[in-house]
């Protein structure tokens, strides 16, 4: 074997060794990345599951609907569902299916699509408000701490899911659950923060809101901040585990 052939053989062996080493390194990196993505995915799934577990849901009513065809009648169910986090976010949904569990599940999904934030001050509404829907009318008034939710079943379900613990309510007109719930949602959507009212009227915050309301609001903000910090600390501890 000549010297040139020997040099060529050595060069080929060196290239093959380098290629094998590079492929092994890439395999290790890909496996490491997959493990990392798996751990991150598991943490993300745990956070989503914990968020789902924190949600409150109330089935207000389930109606049986009958439809007549040539060959007879078919029955289905319609569920009115309220979903909220108990911390100021709530939504109402309506689901239909031939089975009750499926109707409730559809109602929950519909409610989550229509969630909104409710202004609160220390567990109560910010000001008196009236909501309307069809022939139903619902009145909401602020209440002192410890009063509780003075409301009927349909209005109570919305208040509990929205995180309102003290409120005075009155339902007038239609007693149909759908109308009452939608009137309650209309009232909650009309609520405003004191800053919004002051800006709209061109007045200062002290002129619009009484001192007791401002003190309660400051205390509520401090309590909410403390609860949020505790929740973040617990979440960080779980992720570390």
Swiss-Prot record:
GO molecular function: rRNA binding; structural constituent of ribosome
Entry keyword set: Ribonucleoprotein, Ribosomal protein, RNA-binding, rRNA-binding
Gene Ontology cellular component annotations, sorted alphabetically: small ribosomal subunit
Name of the molecule in the record: Small ribosomal subunit protein uS5
Domain notes: The N-terminal domain interacts with the head of the 30S subunit; the C-terminal domain interacts with the body and contacts protein S4. The interaction surface between S4 and S5 is involved in control of translational fidelity.
UniProt-listed InterPro entries: Ribosomal_Su5_D2-typ_SF, Ribosomal_uS5, Ribosomal_uS5_bac-type, Ribosomal_uS5_C, Ribosomal_uS5_N, Ribosomal_uS5_N_CS, Ribsml_uS5_D2-typ_fold_subgr
PROSITE patterns xref list: RIBOSOMAL_S5, S5_DSRBD
Functional note: With S4 and S12 plays an important role in translational accuracy.
Source domain of life: Bacteria
Pfam family, one: Ribosomal_S5
Region (Disordered), start-end ranges: 1-53
Family as reported in the entry's similarity comment: Belongs to the universal ribosomal protein uS5 family.
Domain S5 DRBM stretches: 55-118
Gene: rpsE
Gene3D superfamilies: 3.30.160.20, 3.30.230.10
Bias (Low complexity) ranges: 11-22
GO biological process entries: translation
Biased composition (Basic and acidic residues): 25-53
Species of provenance: Bifidobacterium adolescentis (strain ATCC 15703 / DSM 20083 / NCTC 11814 / E194a)
Subunit and partners: Part of the 30S ribosomal subunit. Contacts proteins S4 and S8.
């Amino acid at each position: 074997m000549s010297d040139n052939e020997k040099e060529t053989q050595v060069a080929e062996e060196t290239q093959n060794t380098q290629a094998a080493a590079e492929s092994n390194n890439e395999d290790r990196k890909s496996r490491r990345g997959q493990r990392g993505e798996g751990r991150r995915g598991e943490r993300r799934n745990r956070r989503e599951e914990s968020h789902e577990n924190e949600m409150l849901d109330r089935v207000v009513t389930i109606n049986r609907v009958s439809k007549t065809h040539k060959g007879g009648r078919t029955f289905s169910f319609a569920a009115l569902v309220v979903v909220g986090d108990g911390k100021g976010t709530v939504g109402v949904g309506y689901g239909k299916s031939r089975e009750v569990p499926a109707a409730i599940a559809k109602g929950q999904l519909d409610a989550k699509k229509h969630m909104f934030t409710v202004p609160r001050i220390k567990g109560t509404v910010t000001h008196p408000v009236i909501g309307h829907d069809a022939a139903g009318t619902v009145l909401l008034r602020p209440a002192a701490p410890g009063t509780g939710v003075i409301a009927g079943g349909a209005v109570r379900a919305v208040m509990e899911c929205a995180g309102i613990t003290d409120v005075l309510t009155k339902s007038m007109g239609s007693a149909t659950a759908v109308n009452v719930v939608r009137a309650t949602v209309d009232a909650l959507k009309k609520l405003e923060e004191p800053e919004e009212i002051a800006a709209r009227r061109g007045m200062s915050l002290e002129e619009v809101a009484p001192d007791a309301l401002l003190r309660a609001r400051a205390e509520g903000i401090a309590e909410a901040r403390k609860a949020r910090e505790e929740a973040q600390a617990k979440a960080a501890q779980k992720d570390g585990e």
